[in-house]
Each structure stands twice: as structure tokens, then as C-alpha cells.
From Swiss-Prot:
Protein name: UPF0145 protein MADE_1007770
InterPro entries per UniProt: UPF0145_dom_sf (IPR035439), UPF0145_YbjQ-like (IPR002765)
Similarity comment: family membership: Belongs to the UPF0145 family.
Organism: Alteromonas mediterranea (strain DSM 17117 / CIP 110805 / LMG 28347 / Deep ecotype)
Signal peptide stretch: none
Family matches, as Pfam families: YbjQ_1
Gene3D superfamilies to which the protein is assigned, alphabetical: Hypothetical protein apc22750. Chain B
Record-linked HAMAP family: UPF0145
Length: 108
């Protein structure tokens, strides 16, 4: 599956447009991770636990997006837009949302 932020793919023509596809993942933030991330922010450095959560959520959202596109008969998704949002009480959850257009492509 080809995924791209651009509306076209170099070296490919778009044969069919199948519509908008979306992948979403919501991850809960752990209280202890929050505590250690706050300490790390104070002393400097990167919060590895949050980076892992972001990576996991992003991978899950991409997997969902690609699955939806394949189920429509697409072999690519163009115009990808990736958004992160903090949701829930006191920002207790992270949502990753990816959208794009499912298409059928062939080489030029």
C-alpha cells in the first residue's frame, strides 16, 4: 500500500478514486508515566514513554487507514493528513487521526 501526503504519485497515474478513508487510534495516558514525564521535563530530556505511545498510536491509525482502503479495492492513499489531539478529562487520552483519499493506481 502506497501512502502519500501529496495528491498525486510520481511515476503513477490514478485510475480510480474510491473516497475518503480514516484511521484513528486513542491511547490512554498512564498516571505514573505522567509523573515521570513531568520530572523529565523539569530536568530536561525526552519523554521516552510518551514517544512510544505516540509511535504506537500512529502505527495503529495507519494500519486502520490501510485496511479500510484495501477493503475498497484501493492500492494507495493520497492526500494524507495526520492530526494529534489530546482528549478526555484533564488531557488523559491521546487521539491520532489520519485521513486521505483511497485510490487505484498503475505505473506510467
Amino acid at each position: 500500500m502506497i501512502v502519500s501526503t501529496t495528491p498525486t504519485l510520481e511515476g503513477h497515474k490514478i485510475d480510480a478514486y474510491y473516497g475518503i478513508v480514516v484511521g484513528e487510534a486513542v491511547m490512554g495516558a498512564n498516571v505514573f508515566k505522567d509523573l515521570f514525564a513531568s520530572i523529565r521535563d523539569i530536568v530536561g530530556g525526552r519523554s521516552g514513554s510518551y514517544e512510544e505511545e505516540l509511535t504506537t498510536a500512529r502505527k495503529l491509525a495507519f494500519t486502520e487507514l490501510e485496511h479500510e482502503a484495501r477493503s475498497m479495492g484501493a492500492n494507495a492513499v493520497v492526500g494524507i493528513d495526520l492530526d494529534y489531539q489530546v482528549i478526555g478529562d484533564k488531557g488523559s487520552m491521546l487521539m491520532v487521526s489520519i485521513s486521505g483519499t483511497a485510490v487505484k493506481t498503475s505505473p506510467l
